[in-house]
Amino acid sequence: MTIPQLDGLQIEVQQEGQGTRETRRGDNVDVHYKGVLTSGKKFDASYDRGEPLNFTVGQGQVIKGWDEGLLGMKIGEKRKLTIAPHLAYGNRAVGGIIPANSTLIFETELVGIKGVQKGE
């Protein structure tokens, strides 16, 4: 599997996915995630809401670290993404929860790719 190498993005595959179809730019995907600061403090988790996040990869709907770090995933795959500030929110604080210039750590799971069956 090809994993993009981008300065400021560390990708650790924690569980392999199924099938051969990998995510690419323009795919509409459903992703479950948990986000924590480097201190370990959780700031968000789709698991808590019981609904994965839906977005289109590579369209700037999410932080750049996600647009790049979720490329090449297969359905069911789990990745840990460690994202430097310049690929996250940079020098902006977010909602009083994420301080400016924060490195973010996400545990992600690709739940689905629109139009692709599990195992394809």
From Swiss-Prot:
Question: Coding gene?
Answer: fkr-2
Role noted for this protein? PPIases accelerate the folding of proteins. It catalyzes the cis-trans isomerization of proline imidic peptide bonds in oligopeptides.
What Gene Ontology terms describe where this protein resides (cellular component)? cytoplasm
InterPro entries linked to this entry? FKBP2/11, PPIase_dom_sf, PPIase_FKBP_dom
Instruction: Tell me the compartments it is located in.
Output: Cytoplasm
Might you name a Gene Ontology BP term for this protein? chaperone-mediated protein folding
Which reaction is this enzyme known to catalyze?
A: [protein]-peptidylproline (omega=180) = [protein]-peptidylproline (omega=0)
Q: What is this protein called?
A: FK506-binding protein 1A
> What single Pfam family name could you report for this chain, choosing any that match?
FKBP_C
Quote one Gene Ontology molecular function term: peptidyl-prolyl cis-trans isomerase activity
The entry sums up its family as follows: Belongs to the FKBP-type PPIase family. FKBP1 subfamily.
EC id: 5.2.1.8
- Name the domain of life this protein comes from: Eukaryota
Please give the organism: Neurospora crassa (strain ATCC 24698 / 74-OR23-1A / CBS 708.71 / DSM 1257 / FGSC 987)
